[in-house]
Amino acid sequence: AEVFLNDLSKVYRYLLRNNEDGMSTVRTEVQFIQSYFDLLKTRHGDALFLQMDIDKRYDDYLLPTLSLQMLVENAVKHNALSRNYPLHIEVFTTVGNKLVVNNNIQKRAQKAPSGEVGLKNIRMKYELLNQPGFQVMNDGKNFTAVLPLIWEKTMRNRPLHYSENKN
């Protein structure tokens, strides 16, 4: 219970401090998603797995705040999770300054209502930043989102500001 409350407080603190910020560092988002995932793991147990492979050279690159959380939440919302058929979520960096979030598709018996609000929100943030390259792909077996990572020096005089970890 103590570990759960600690993770819950980290998630809540991050949401309160960073929800208004437009951009966060990869380091900050990855730290947050680990705490968020720990909460999901408490609920879903062995029905959910997260694998992260983030190259440290991207730690100070930027991406829209809460993008990873929206994509992980999207994966959990739209897929069936069970111990026999676990949901696997991968988060990794790749050449060309990109962060990829990929999950296997396991359709729910009852489709969750969706207006694709999270995906539209991420797309809109990249458009506001005039940053091309956000992609979403669904091949029927995997759902993949590609997030362009932005070098801080290119963000000067942009409409959204960014946050470093404020914990």
What does each model-found stretch correspond to?
Residues 1-148, 153:
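Two-component histidine phosphotransfer core
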Residues 152-167:
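C-terminal end segment of the histidine kinase catalytic
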